[in-house]
Amino acid sequence: MKFAKCLTLTVALAIAFAAAALQAQDQRQPAPLVPKFVKGSASDVIAADIFDTIIYLPVKIGGQGPYSFVLDTGNGGTPVLDEKLARALGVPLGTRIPITGGAGSTPVDLYPIEKLDLSMPGLTFSEVPAATLPLDLMDPHWGKHKDGLVGGTVFSVAITDIDYAKKTVRFSDPKTFTPAAGEVIPIEVFGQPFVRAKVFLHGSSQPVEAFLMVDTGVRVTTFNSPFSKTNKLVEQSPKSLATMTGFGINGASWGTIGRVQAIELGSIRIENPVVDFSTDTAGALSSDRFAGILGADMLRRFHVVFDYPGQRMILEKNAEFGAPFEFDMSGLRLVAEGKDFSRIKVFHVADKTPAQAAGLQAGDEIRTVDGRKASTFNWETLRAYFQRPGRTVKLEIVRDGKPIAATLTLERLV
């Protein structure tokens, strides 16, 4: 199941490298990117594919496509294409740059792209600097293929209206934008948007101030390891689970899943959220320059408008606002392999969990879940299936070519 929080942070650092590489190749200052709205001062209302809280939009590259791009505030720089797609399209690539910086420490290759033409329904950009990364490395952990990421290029010049409930996105010209209903939350934009929030801990009436990156490309809200350690966040959580929490293009990330009493944004109070307390000692989640990440599992509870030029975010509660925060109750971290993501395998088993008690191991392939073929689940339905406390789940797995039966009883782990 997908906890790919570090991908976008790695990408943010990668884009900095790409920008430096492009500047070295051409000392001229690039002209500001100007979006062209095909009809008036706004794009079409774009039907978004919101899968596991992550927003996928149709994007054309040089008139070809559309391809599936993640709309990602965590990508504060230029768009990112999957390297295989860029090569298939014959896009000219610059000099290879090995990078690290997110989850894990294994270098991967970035290639700068001097310019691309990008378009979405009702909106076009010409000659946009971009970069490639091997985004397909993340596909098994996301349970879905992505062709690219688009973020700061659009957010910096267009008002972005995201209606999670209706699964739509619309971009507007800041000059003609009329503010929507909802609470205005000030943001500070440093490539990515940041908010100042109050974090209330269990057992304390005094909040902790937190400077959080707002990231639509991350599911679970995460606190960086220095912030978690300084404020003893793990100790205050009523229950917690130490486990693998992320897998970025540079490798795995580790942390402790737990809860805080509440997070406040302006006058909006979000009760008892599930959060990740990072224990990383290297990479972006070990940074003390910001407290952590406000993820999409919180954002999906609102109609969200990002107004970078106006330094504000507008939040209007939707029907999901009061829904409880839940987390996996099995102890399994799964990956989906194969062209259609139909092969479900165990990637990691957390200690002292139902999955460990049932004898499940990394590498096991799950064939059936309560008699139903595992391939008939998608990421969202499978996650929901493992989030019901007290449910007994019978699995048929294959290990070393041999079928094995396993039974586990789900329990609330955080």
Where are these regions (language model features)?
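Positively charged n-region of N-terminal signal peptides that target proteins for export
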Residues: 1-5
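Pepsin/retropepsin-fold aspartyl endopeptidases
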Residues: 21-414
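Bacterial N-terminal signal peptides
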Residues: 8-18
